Each structure stands twice: as structure tokens, then as C-alpha cells.
Amino acid sequence: MINITLPDDSIKSFKEYPKGMDVARGISEGFARNCVAMEIDGQLLDLDVEIRNDCAVRLITTRDAEAVEILRHSAAHVMAEAVQNLHADAKLTIGPVVEDGFYYDIDMAPISDADFPKIEAEMAKIVKAKKPFQRSEITKQEALELFKDNPYKVELINGLDDQTISIYQQGDFVDLCRGPHIPHTGMIKGLKLMKTSGAYWRADQEKAQLQRLYGTAFFDKKELKAYLHLIEEAKKRDHRKIGTRMGLFSFHQEAAGMPFFHAKGMEMWNELLAYWRDEHRAAGYVETKTPVMMSRHLWEKSGHWENYRENMYTSVVDGEEYAIKPMNCPGGMLLYKTESHSYRDLPLRAGEIGLVHRHELSGALSGLFRVRAFHQDDAHIFMTPEQIESEILGVLELVERIYSRFGLGFHLELSTRPKKSIGSDEQWAEATNGLKNALDKYGQPYAINEGDGAFYGPKIDIHIKDALGRTWQCGTVQLDMALPERFDLTYKGADNEKHRPIMIHRVIYGSIERFFGILVEHFAGKFPLWLAPVQAVVLPINDDLADHAQTVKKELESNGIRCDVDLRTESLKKKIREAQVNYVPLIITIGEKEKESGTLSVRTLDGKVRMGLSMADFIPPVLAHIRARQLDEDIL
């Protein structure tokens, strides 16, 4: 008799070895139809796996978070089969699940969007056939024989230590895979190819160039339709298009992956940094600055040279090898060591807006979201073990204040100790409990990612949610047990002995360039008044009023309002329309009447028009709105 314990503590008993699907059917046929896989002892398995011992089983249904990833993994196999059916000489490499979908790298002749309908039609046939996904385990030698005509699979197999290799079959199609998979192809209701791009085998430019084919999949066609609508909305908000139209930033081949910020973009940039500095000063941080380029010896000491060398830019100065910093942390360690510290000095909170460079393959670059040079708002907090909880709580409260200023919600994830880590069990327990207790006190729900922490300490990842409901991982709070050890950081305790400080490494904006791009898309270019690159524009109705318009502009600027004047010979209607398209919050029209009375006619983006406003009526509420960094459009 095999006894299966379900999550509600109920027990299902079977005379013979049951499969996962048998357990599901034991609940109900309707429930079984929605089951995708099962979890036993933390491992996800196919539903046709036999259960040979008493155990606890969690059945994964289409409603569970893991289900979509399993579905998309299976969809990648469907896409691969379709491509092979149409292109017999295509050689498959790898096909992982990625955010919002999946891709498969394939050695084949170049394809384009024009080929998608044919491939999608073939995929639809495979889905309609409801082909079961069948797992088999074969020897390494058998696997090499099976895939002997595919050098990429042979290389993958030779790189495996396992002597038993798992493969999956749907009909006549066979692929190398660990699984698990959905029961059959018919469970894929919404399936769509998204785009194609080039890629290199093993991400090595010296190796074969492949075709990377992206797709997405859902359990429901309505979900696919909603997702495609979201994609279209995102295209309208593309920060690259809006940034170009509004004159915020640009990219040039002479510095690939390194953005150029224009005057209007710098107005926004400076506002972001001014706000960051105001909040950090109020929270007890000091601001520091470390060099952009430092000696190889420093990077060897920090561990970056060993683990991150291929992403670093280097140079030789006076016969010594230097590296442009990919991260700010090691410089922060040197700053801490320049002075002796007592427990009375702690916590010490030091922030830096540091310019870092990381080499990215040209194919991976994507606007402001993926660049080679960017600024990171790092801060390092040095503390005693007793201060962990209160400092983490302080960081979370600071995160909430900053993100809320932009109308960004967020959720939290706690990542715990991975298999490979440094530090003792006691250190990890103390660090993890400190994070957990702070999260519990903070009171917002959080997920736990077991084993997903950094090797040097547990962390909290902060995922913001934008206006389209998309999530972005920007902020992170990490407890670092490696760098204080590597740099021999100490403080004198109450016992007059030397102790190792606990260090938090945290970012809130993350890459400021990336955060800038997120804000462009979040607001779709319609920024709140305090952040808008141009806060007001003066439009004279004819050329005779140009001098007066300039006088108005200068007075507004002298009061701290960012203002332009449009002196073109276009119609007033066209100039108003262009100002609205560029989301200028305050559109001021000047006619003879306004000149004579010394007043303004002001139009706001919510469609309201205020006539006959004196400077005394206009400037104070505008400045109050700016200084309060308000989000709403109710300015006057």
C-alpha cells in the first residue's frame, strides 16, 4: 500500500505504485485535467512518474506559478519540432524558458518574421495532435549515438557528469532534456512566435552564429491576447522612441552601449539625483566617491578578477594592470579601512552614485535597459550583528518612500543560503533571521526563494511594478559576509576587542540609466511636474510679442521653473498641439491682452485653462507643487 499525503494533510492510498496522474484522478477527473506536474521533496516531476514510496505530493495545476514555466518549456519543444519538420537540416542547440516566454537557438539558414506563419501553422498541428511528452533515461553512450548528427547536443552530452541521460519524446521528435513537461501538447492553448535574432553558441563570438527564435505560450487564448495587447502598449511607451522624440538621450556607434544624455535628459537626471540625495541625507547617509579605475590587486582581493574578469575593461598604467570598476563595492571597503571604527560609530551608512562599466555582447544591448556604462546608487551600511534588523527595516522604509514618489508599487523576495556559500551556519542563521525579522516587522507579504541567495549572504530582491503591470527588479538588499572578511574590516567593540562588522550592500534605483528608462515607459513621457524636463513653455501668438515672451520666460526661470519659449512662425494651434504631444505640463499663451495686463493664460495637460493669472497667482502654487514632488496634475 502506498500512502500519498496531500497539502491539506489528507491521505490517498493506492494498492499499486501510482503515477502522479493517478493521484490527481483520485481527487477528481476535472482536477486532473488541470494538472501539469507534481512536486515531491522539492523536486518537480512529470505526472507519469511512478511513486514507489509513501511521501507528500503537491500537484501543480495551471493556476500555480510553476505551471507557466513548465508549459513554456514544453512549448519550446513544440517549436523545435515544427522548425525541424520544415527545415530538416536545422540543428537544435538549447531552448530555455526566459521571462515572458522561451527561445530556442538553432543552427539554420536565417529566418525572419515572414517565416512565422508557416512555423506557427506547423506548431498548431503538433498542439492539435495532443502528443504525449514521454521521458526516457538512456546511457551516455546511447545518447551520443542518438544525437551523433548534432554536434551541439554531442558537446552538451560530453559535458555532463551523469552516466544516465534523460530525453523527452513527442511523437517522432526527440530532444535532450531534464524536464519536467506538461502531459501532452494539447494543453498549450495560446502559442505565438515573437521575434528572431542572432546568437552565438555558448555566447562566444568565436563560435557558430545561430538563429534565436523567441516565442511565448499560455494555458488560455485570452491570456495570450491580453499579453499581446500589453506588448502593443509597451511598444507605444518604448523609452527609446519617447527619449528620441523628447530629446532626452541618444546612442551613437562611436560608444556602443554608452548613452549620451542631452540637456533635457540631464534636467531629469539631476532631479532624480537631487531627490535621492535629499532622502538619503534625511536617512542618515553620507555620500562618498571612489575612483573609476583601480589596480588589478584590488580586484584580485575582492574576488572580481577571478569571477568577473571577462566583463571588465582593463588598461596598463606605468606597467601595472588596472581595471575600470564594474562595481563600486571594493572602493567602499578601502574607504572604510582609512579610519579606525568603534561600535559607537556604527551603523555607518555610506552611499555612492558610482559610474561602472561592464562588458556586454553587442547583441545583448537594449536601449537604457542593457548598457555597458551606467551609474549605480550603491550604499554600504556597516553595523554590529544586533543592528541588522533595524537597519534592514530602515532600508525597506526608505525604498517605500522613494518608489512611492514615482507611483511605483513593489513586492519583496527573500533569497536564502545556496549550496555553495561562505560563512558558518551560525552566521547564515543570524543573517537570514535578521532579514526575515525585518521583513516580518515591515508587514508587507514576501516570497521566499530557497537557496537563491548570493554565495556571500542572503538578500532581499525588490521588484517594482509599473503602470502596465510589468515588474522590474531594481532594488536589492544584500548581507555581504565576503568583502568584510577579504578586506579585514574591523571595529572595536564594547569589550575593547576587534570585531568583524556586518555589511549591507543595497541599491534602490539600481542602474540609474535603467531606472530612467523604466520611468520613461512608466509615465509614457508624461512626467509629473517636478520631474518634467520642460515644466512650462511660453507661446506668443505673434512675432510682435516675442520680446515679452522672453521676459516671461526669464522671470519663470529666475524663480526656479524650467521654461522654454516657442518663437517659431507656426500657428498657435500647432504650437499648443506640439507642446501637448511632448507633455509640457504648463502651456502659457501670450497675447496683447496678457501683455497689457501682465497676466498669463495657462493650459494644463488635464485640459483645464486658467485665464488672467498674475505672476503672483501662478508662481507660488507651481513652486509648491514642484518642491513637494507631487504626482498629481492638479497644479493650479
Swiss-Prot record:
A Gene Ontology biological process term: threonyl-tRNA aminoacylation
Location of the TGS domain: 1-61
SMART domains from the UniProt entry: tRNA_SAD
Domain of life: Bacteria
Binding locations of Zn(2+): 329, 380, 505
InterPro entries assigned to the protein according to its UniProt record, in alphabetical order: aa-tRNA-synt_IIb, aa-tRNA-synth_II, aa-tRNA-synth_II/BPL/LPL, Anticodon-bd, Anticodon-bd_dom_sf, Beta-grasp_dom_sf, TGS, TGS-like
Comment on bound cofactor: Binds 1 zinc ion per subunit.
Cofactor(s) the record lists: Zn(2+)
Keyword Transmembrane helix (UniProt): no
Pfam families in the record: HGTP_anticodon, TGS, tRNA-synt_2b, tRNA_SAD
Region: Catalytic, residue numbers: 238-528
Enzyme Commission numbers on file: 6.1.1.3
Intracellular or extracellular location(s): Cytoplasm
Chemical reaction(s) catalysed: tRNA(Thr) + L-threonine + ATP = L-threonyl-tRNA(Thr) + AMP + diphosphate + H(+)
Recorded family membership: Belongs to the class-II aminoacyl-tRNA synthetase family.
Known role: Catalyzes the attachment of threonine to tRNA(Thr) in a two-step reaction: L-threonine is first activated by ATP to form Thr-AMP and then transferred to the acceptor end of tRNA(Thr). Also edits incorrectly charged L-seryl-tRNA(Thr).
Subunit structure: Homodimer.
Protein name: Threonine--tRNA ligase
Lineage start: Bacteria, Pseudomonadati, Thermodesulfobacteriota, Desulfobacteria, Desulfobacterales
Gene designation: thrS
